[in-house]
Protein backbone atom coordinates (compact mmCIF):
# COMPACT_ATOMS: atom_id res chain seq x y z
CA UNK A 1 0.00 0.00 0.00
CA UNK A 2 1.30 3.46 -0.90
CA UNK A 3 2.33 5.83 1.87
CA UNK A 4 -0.27 8.48 2.56
CA UNK A 5 0.35 12.12 3.45
CA UNK A 6 -1.98 15.00 4.17
CA UNK A 7 -1.42 18.73 4.00
CA UNK A 8 -2.91 22.17 3.82
CA UNK A 9 -2.33 24.69 1.04
CA UNK A 10 -2.70 27.93 2.99
CA UNK A 11 -3.64 31.00 0.97
CA UNK A 12 -4.07 34.70 1.62
CA UNK A 13 -5.09 37.70 -0.43
CA UNK A 14 -2.87 40.75 -0.59
CA UNK A 15 -2.50 42.68 -3.85
CA UNK A 16 -2.84 39.20 -5.37
CA UNK A 17 -3.70 35.73 -4.16
CA UNK A 18 -0.67 34.04 -2.58
CA UNK A 19 -0.08 30.48 -1.38
CA UNK A 20 2.31 29.29 1.31
CA UNK A 21 4.97 26.82 0.16
CA UNK A 22 7.78 25.22 2.16
CA UNK A 23 11.25 24.00 1.23
CA UNK A 24 12.43 20.70 2.72
CA UNK A 25 15.43 20.86 5.01
CA UNK A 26 18.47 18.61 5.05
CA UNK A 27 21.47 18.14 2.81
CA UNK A 28 19.64 16.34 -0.01
CA UNK A 29 17.47 19.41 -0.72
CA UNK A 30 19.99 22.17 0.15
CA UNK A 31 20.83 23.14 -3.45
CA UNK A 32 17.47 22.33 -5.04
CA UNK A 33 14.86 24.96 -5.77
CA UNK A 34 12.55 24.51 -8.77
CA UNK A 35 10.20 21.54 -8.48
CA UNK A 36 11.39 20.74 -4.95
CA UNK A 37 9.13 22.77 -2.63
CA UNK A 38 5.95 21.39 -1.11
CA UNK A 39 2.76 22.33 0.62
CA UNK A 40 3.10 21.82 4.40
CA UNK A 41 2.25 18.11 4.76
CA UNK A 42 3.29 14.84 6.32
CA UNK A 43 2.43 11.20 6.81
CA UNK A 44 -0.92 10.17 8.21
CA UNK A 45 -0.47 8.01 11.33
CA UNK A 46 -2.35 4.72 11.66
CA UNK A 47 -5.91 5.43 12.78
CA UNK A 48 -5.52 9.20 12.24
CA UNK A 49 -8.02 11.15 10.17
CA UNK A 50 -6.30 12.79 7.17
CA UNK A 51 -7.53 16.31 8.04
CA UNK A 52 -6.27 15.92 11.62
CA UNK A 53 -2.90 14.80 10.22
CA UNK A 54 -2.84 17.79 7.85
CA UNK A 55 -3.46 20.22 10.73
CA UNK A 56 -0.85 18.48 12.93
CA UNK A 57 1.76 18.56 10.18
CA UNK A 58 1.08 22.22 9.41
CA UNK A 59 1.82 23.08 13.04
CA UNK A 60 4.90 20.86 13.23
CA UNK A 61 6.45 22.13 10.02
CA UNK A 62 5.80 25.83 10.66
CA UNK A 63 6.21 25.76 14.44
CA UNK A 64 2.97 27.70 14.84
CA UNK A 65 -0.76 27.18 15.15
CA UNK A 66 -2.53 29.02 12.36
CA UNK A 67 -6.10 30.24 12.44
CA UNK A 68 -7.64 28.81 9.29
CA UNK A 69 -10.94 29.55 7.58
CA UNK A 70 -12.75 28.69 4.35
CA UNK A 71 -11.48 25.09 4.34
CA UNK A 72 -11.94 23.34 0.98
CA UNK A 73 -11.04 19.76 0.03
CA UNK A 74 -8.53 19.73 -2.86
CA UNK A 75 -8.53 15.96 -3.31
CA UNK A 76 -5.55 13.67 -3.82
CA UNK A 77 -2.51 13.40 -6.07
CA UNK A 78 0.01 10.60 -6.49
CA UNK A 79 3.63 11.77 -6.42
CA UNK A 80 6.34 10.29 -8.65
CA UNK A 81 7.57 7.86 -5.95
CA UNK A 82 4.01 6.62 -5.39
CA UNK A 83 3.07 8.51 -2.23
CA UNK A 84 -0.57 9.64 -2.19
CA UNK A 85 -1.06 13.19 -0.89
CA UNK A 86 -4.46 14.52 0.19
CA UNK A 87 -4.78 18.27 0.64
CA UNK A 88 -7.12 20.99 1.75
CA UNK A 89 -6.98 24.67 0.92
CA UNK A 90 -7.56 27.16 3.73
CA UNK A 91 -7.34 30.90 4.20
CA UNK A 92 -4.74 31.86 6.79
CA UNK A 93 -1.65 33.93 7.45
CA UNK A 94 1.89 33.21 8.62
CA UNK A 95 5.13 35.17 8.89
CA UNK A 96 7.83 33.08 7.14
CA UNK A 97 10.42 34.79 9.36
CA UNK A 98 8.83 33.04 12.34
CA UNK A 99 9.44 29.55 10.90
CA UNK A 100 10.40 27.12 13.68
CA UNK A 101 10.16 23.67 12.07
CA UNK A 102 10.51 20.38 13.87
CA UNK A 103 13.73 18.45 13.13
CA UNK A 104 14.86 15.02 12.01
CA UNK A 105 18.19 13.24 12.50
CA UNK A 106 20.31 11.46 9.94
CA UNK A 107 23.89 10.32 9.51
CA UNK A 108 25.80 13.17 7.86
CA UNK A 109 28.15 13.12 6.06
CA UNK A 110 27.29 9.64 4.76
CA UNK A 111 29.21 6.76 6.37
CA UNK A 112 30.76 9.19 8.90
CA UNK A 113 29.06 7.67 11.93
CA UNK A 114 27.98 11.19 12.94
CA UNK A 115 24.30 11.98 13.40
CA UNK A 116 23.08 15.52 12.79
CA UNK A 117 19.73 17.20 13.24
CA UNK A 118 18.17 19.12 10.34
CA UNK A 119 14.93 21.10 10.16
CA UNK A 120 12.14 19.29 8.36
CA UNK A 121 11.44 22.62 6.62
CA UNK A 122 14.22 25.19 6.16
CA UNK A 123 12.25 27.93 4.37
CA UNK A 124 8.69 29.07 3.87
CA UNK A 125 7.47 31.64 1.36
CA UNK A 126 4.31 33.30 0.10
CA UNK A 127 4.20 33.12 -3.69
CA UNK A 128 1.67 33.78 -6.42
CA UNK A 129 0.18 30.73 -8.21
CA UNK A 130 2.49 30.94 -11.25
CA UNK A 131 5.58 30.87 -9.01
CA UNK A 132 4.06 28.10 -6.89
CA UNK A 133 3.75 25.94 -10.01
CA UNK A 134 7.46 26.46 -10.71
CA UNK A 135 8.56 25.69 -7.15
CA UNK A 136 6.27 22.83 -6.13
CA UNK A 137 6.91 19.16 -6.71
CA UNK A 138 5.18 18.48 -10.05
CA UNK A 139 2.26 16.42 -8.72
CA UNK A 140 1.42 19.07 -6.13
CA UNK A 141 0.85 21.80 -8.72
CA UNK A 142 -2.62 20.28 -9.19
CA UNK A 143 -3.53 21.57 -5.71
CA UNK A 144 -2.86 25.16 -6.85
CA UNK A 145 -5.06 24.66 -9.92
CA UNK A 146 -7.85 23.14 -7.84
CA UNK A 147 -7.65 25.97 -5.31
CA UNK A 148 -7.97 28.55 -8.10
CA UNK A 149 -11.16 26.83 -9.28
CA UNK A 150 -12.86 27.64 -5.97
CA UNK A 151 -11.11 30.84 -4.81
CA UNK A 152 -11.53 34.02 -6.83
CA UNK A 153 -8.00 35.30 -7.62
CA UNK A 154 -7.33 38.97 -6.94
CA UNK A 155 -5.93 40.58 -10.10
CA UNK A 156 -2.87 38.51 -10.89
CA UNK A 157 -1.29 36.33 -13.51
CA UNK A 158 -2.29 32.70 -13.09
Where do the PLM segments sit?
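N-terminal strand-loop-strand
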Residues: 1-39, 88
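Short, charged/polar surface micro-motifs in flexible loops or helix N-caps
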Residues: 14-17, 26-29, 45-46, 81-82, ...
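Active-site-adjacent beta-strand/loop module that shapes the phosphate/pyrophosphate-binding cleft
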Residues: 76-113, 125, 147
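The catalytic Nudix box helix
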Residues: 39-73, 128
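Membrane-topology and secretion signals of cell-surface/extracellular proteins
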Residues: 32-34, 38, 50, 64, ...
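Non-DNA-binding regulatory cores of transcription-related proteins
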Residues: 116-122
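Charged phosphate-binding loop/patch that engages nucleotide di/tri-phosphates or the phosphate backbone
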Residues: 125, 129-158
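Residues that scaffold the ATP/ADP-binding catalytic core of kinase and kinase-like folds
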Residues: 31, 47, 135
